[in-house]
Structure formats: structure tokens, C-alpha cells
Design a protein with these regions (language model features):
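HIT superfamily nucleotide-processing domains
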Residues: 2-129
């Protein structure tokens, strides 16, 4: 699998980005997983009993900035999500499960402008009437 060429894009971070600071270890987090391409950590204000984020180490502000060069990276995030969901305590498919949310842009609910995937499982507070 070919990922985005991180070696030639080492400077692609944002010094003011809270997620870039978490990746750099400047802000503490409860790490779920890390490899050379992504970092996953528990949400500080969870909406569900299991709620963590998967973020690319490369600073990509939103889905609007994705290119075909990022396809393998996004595929990696998508295939990693179910593995981490099970690891963190989600019940397996089909009776269990989890939800993936990718907010895009301010009007789409994105609060931190560094691409991130919410993975939530357990009770479903978003179904409240």
C-alpha cells in the first residue's frame, strides 16, 4: 500500500493546531493507537461511552483538501476504525457496532480544522429526541 509521501512533506503541520500539538506530545492525550501515519486518542468530551478520534499525522485541514494522493491514508483510517472500536470495547457486528463521523467545515460541525474521524460506540445519545 502506498501512502502519501510524508518524507517530503515533514513541514506539513500547523503550529497553532491543537491536534498537531497532541501528535507532537505538546498537549497530553489518552492515546488509543499510533503508527507512522495516524494517531488515535480518546475524545475529551465524549458523546458515547466509547468515543475516540483517528487523525492523520499530516496536517490536512478538512476533507475538502483531500486529493487522490491521500486515498491510501483514508483507507488506512477506515480499516483501522473497526479494529480499534473492538479493542476499545465496542461489541462486534452485527448486534454491536459503532458510528464513524467526519465533520467537514464549520457549517458541517467541524470544530478543529485538522481532518479527524470520530469513532463512537455503546449507547447512542445522538438518538435522543
Amino acid at each position: 500500500m502506498t501512502f502519501f509521501d510524508f518524507e517530503s512533506h515533514q513541514a506539513m503541520t500547523d503550529a497553532n493546531c491543537i491536534f498537531c500539538k497532541i501528535i507532537a506530545g505538546q498537549i497530553p492525550s489518552r492515546k488509543v493507537y499510533e503508527d507512522e501515519h495516524v494517531f488515535a486518542f480518546h475524545d475529551i468530551a465524549p458523546w458515547a461511552p466509547i468515543h475516540f478520534l483517528i487523525i492523520p499525522k499530516l496536517h490536512i485541514p478538512s476533507m475538502a483538501q483531500l486529493t487522490t494522493e491521500h486515498a491510501a491514508l483514508m483507507g488506512h483510517m477506515m480499516t483501522l476504525a473497526p479494529k480499534l472500536a473492538l479493542q476499545e470495547g465496542c461489541n462486534p457486528y452485527p448486534d454491536g457496532g459503532f458510528r464513524i463521523v467526519l465533520n467537514n467545515g464549520t457549517e458541517g460541525g467541524q470544530e478543529v480544522h485538522h481532518l479527524h474521524m470520530h469513532v463512537m460506540g455503546g449507547s447512542r445519545p445522538w438518538l435522543r429526541g
